[in-house]
Amino acid sequence: MTAVQLPDFADELVAAMAARDTNRAEIPVIQPAEPFLDMAGEDLRRRIYLTENENGDSLCLRPEFTIPVCLGHIAGQVGTPRRYSYLGQVFRQRREGGNEFYQAGIEDLGETDTAASDARAIADAADLLGQLLPGTGLTITIGDQALFEAVVAGLGLPAGWQKRLIHAFGDDAALARMIESLASAQSSTVEESELGELIAAGDVTALAEHIGTVMEETGYSSHASRLPEEIATRLVEKTELEKTRLSDTAFAALKTFLSLDAPLSEAVDMLRGFAEDAGLASGPALELFAARVEGIKASGADLSSMRWRAAFGRPLDYYTGLVFEISANGAVLAGGGRYDRMMTLLGATEEIPAVGFSLWIDRIEAARNAKERGQ
């Protein structure tokens, strides 16, 4: 395997990140696999290089930096707010390009001013790219998972459907399939039997007792599979989802929201108009979005290069709010977002707000080379 060399601008980039009040994180290449498998999303999970140690523990080659930076912060019991920077190789199976490549980035942990830290993440990523690619036109696409979650909740869907739709956010094809299935009536698969009656009634406790009795009578051990309570909960949820249908009004509202696309400078007014037309309360998600836009303006960033798309998400399960990508000539050079729930899921004893971004070093290098060739 040919070694992947650091680009000639690596030292410049490291210095530029350090100048932004960051602490350099040194992350081992070999990582415990479980946190990535649990939180990284299907797109990344299927690209991870997995192995085991002699104790049978699942390990992997480092597929990204955000999760291990957070784990390192928790293990070090370091106070917040604290900003980390990194530059190193990541390892992923890819259809195009090498399977090992460099990423750099900044993770901002513990800053309680959400709007300001969101704006700073976008500005830092854009400024670093501007330093490495002077004179190159950058396009910034912004989305917000919290806005989508608020709209879905406002439509009154069952929790199971909300969870499914939120999980699919960022995967346009999967989301479209779910919305279409919600718009059409579905036949129930519940059988006419005692089990079927319990499922249809939605009585999880009675259903779990019935399943437990059947498992005992058949000698089926719950240690080999899920517990009766888990099975009962899933069966009731599945039936509830099958019976759910979006009203024509709610379906139209969801489709309209996902079609919203505007320059960032016009996005807040567009969102307020949508909420009024759809009969939805503006709520904290919209107010935070508006505050973030004001924070971006206050940072002196050029809003003319920024566009908001309601349907825009990124294929990582840990995002909770802001998501963004920065492109040049059709190539995505940076991406990031907010992941406020991840720190507690990884073991932090208190909630720690977090936002960050990664730079794709191989793509930046290709863009620099193309610029030098005058392409």
Predicted regions and their residues:
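A conserved hydrophobic position in a structured secondary element of the catalytic/binding core
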Residues: L61, G143, L359
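Short amphipathic alpha-helical patches
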Residues: L37-G41, V152-G156, D171-M178, S188-S193, ...
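Positively charged, Gly/Ser-enriched RNA/tRNA-binding surfaces
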Residues: T2-D21, Q31-P32, E64-V78, R83-G135, ...
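Polyanion/phosphate-binding surface patch
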Residues: V29-L59, Y84-S85, G97
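Acidic, His- and aromatic-enriched active-site or binding-groove loops in soluble protein domains
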Residues: R46-N55, G156-S188
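Internal, well-ordered domain-core segments that constitute the primary functional module
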Residues: Q103-A173
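Short secondary-structure junctions
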Residues: T22-I27, R46-L50, S305-M306
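Beta-rich nucleic-acid/ligand-interaction surfaces
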Residues: I27-R46, G143-A153, F312-T320
